[in-house]
Every structure is written in C-alpha cells, then in structure tokens.
Amino acid sequence: MLDNHQKHFVSANDFDKYVNHKLKLNLPWINECGSKARKKALVNAETAFKKFFDDLASFPRFKKKSYQAVKLYFPKNNKGDWTIWRHKLMVPTLKQVRLKEFGYLPVGAVVISGTVSYVAGRFYVSIVVDIDEKSKHNKDLETSYRTATDGIGIDLGIKDLAVVSDGRKFKNINKSSKVKRLEKRLRREQRCLSRKYESKKKKGGKIATASANIEKQKLKVQKLHQRIKQIREDYENKVIHEIVKQKPRFITVEDLNVKGMMKNRHLAKAVAAQRFNCLLTKLKHKAEIIGIEVHMVDRFYPSSKTCHVCGHIHKGLKLTDRVYICPECGYTEDRDFNASLNLRDAKKYRVA
C-alpha cells in the first residue's frame, strides 16, 4: 500500500494498525470477519505491490468483490481446527464438512491454515500443511520413475502442445471433440446471457441489480468455463508426468514471449488456450522435485529455422511450412521435431 502524504510504502503490519485504531471506528462492518483473515488480505496486497516494485508483475488491479470467486481464509486457532479424516474435514466456524473427493488431503497432517473458495457453484478447499524435509518429496513416486536418460528438448506450439526430441508428440487438447463441443455450448450460453442483459436494458432496469434469471444464466456460463479449465489443467498434468517419468538428465525449453505472441490477433485465442506459462511453471516445479535440471534457451534462438544436421539457418521458412527442408544439405524433417532437436543440443542457456 502507498501513503500519498508520506510518499513511502506502507507494510501490511502498519496498515493493519491503521485499520484497528482508526478505520474500524467508522466502519463497524470490518469486525464481521476475523482479524487474521483481514490480516491475510493485507499481506496478499503487500506481496502484490512488492512484486510490482521488483518488476515481477504489473501494478495490482482493484478487484471488485462481485466479480471475484468467493474465498474465505480460516487460520488454525484451536487444536481441533482443520483436523483431516478420510471423508471429512474440521473447518473452523463451519465445523465438520464432508468431502466429495477422497485421497487428496493427507490424513492426520499438521495444518497451519486453509482457504475455502466458491467457484461456479462448487466449494473447494486448499490447505497449508507443515511437513518435515524427509517427507517433502514423494519417495514412492520418485522410485517409480525410470533410470536417468539423456537430456531432451521440448518445442511448444499451437498445432501440437509439445514435441519432444525423443519422438513423443502431445496433441493440442483444444482441438479435441470434447473441448470443441463445450466451447460451442459456451458460446451459445454466453449469447443467451447477453440477450437477457439487453432485454433488461430495454425495460429500463439496472444491470447492477441482476434478476434471478440472469444469475442462473451466469452460473451456467461459469460452470462451462470451469469445466473447460479443468480439462486443460488435467491434460497439462498428464503431459508433464509423461515427460518427467523418463527422468532425463535435463530438459531444454524455449523462453517463450507469450505476451508478444498474444499481440497477434490471429493467434491470440489459440495461444491463450495453450496456457504456456502455466505449463512451464508446473514443469519447473515437478522437475525440481525429481531432481531434473531445466534449461531455458533465449527466445531469439532460431530453433525452427536451424538445420539440425549442418547448422544452416533457413531465413525464408514461414509459419505455414510444416516440413523443414534444408536448402544446403537437403535434410528433411518435421519443423517442430527439428526444433526440439536443436533445443536439446543448444549450448547457450540459463538454468531455470
């Protein structure tokens, strides 16, 4: 938070003191939530501003409550809070809550805090668990992986999500019939929602006070968005598991300029649907757990235009050319597979 009068950064602790001693006197509704939950929101705001000052993120945007997923932060105040059983969970204030899905939360774990969120008509819980270093990594999972192999290069793209230098190819899940069918339904429900808004405007109603029919239609749209998102996330996790279970010595990927790619209005939607940044973040995290080094090659490295055999750079190669034909030595190969081989053998990189 920024103080306009003193022109300096105000920490979460200082702002919390201001809320307790001054702001809370005029705004009694602040007492409706717990002090630790309020402090957590201030800490999150402080973290967002620090990332902005360190050039790690853009300036924090104001997030209107009605446009955000409902999230409730519950600290552990008593010994019995956040006790985990196989089929239920002790949530502070809400008491025992049954779980729809089993096996995701560690039974008997020491929970520090948790957050309950409401997204598209469903409740989700995420918890912070205190674990020791010995059990930090899943040893049973690590031993199930194969012995270490040579390094691999991965070329990410739109036609296929990932092409690996060992010959594996992972398709674009957004081209599957299931996702296309859901996107078609989403467009139809969005048009229906838009018509309801337009109808209310013609009748002179206030859009801010939406009707019950509009709220029901919004929930349908939210559920479709959530379903498509879950399909993409599940596919990403499966792709990453298939890549790291071979346990290569290193994984080389290109440092993609996703923000620049989004400026192309013809490719922006397809690039956004591929979720490259999310995929790379998960890959780095999983590789760190297994002990695999991730190499990041500069985004200006011509991996697709370089011949893997003779090293000639084919400057006339277009995005529509799906087969790489070297004008010097005649080497012919799929352009994405050729790029993955060049990434694998790249000499200049940085360790992620």
Question: What is each stretch, according to the model?
Answer:
Residues 1-352:
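Nucleic-acid substrate recognition interfaces
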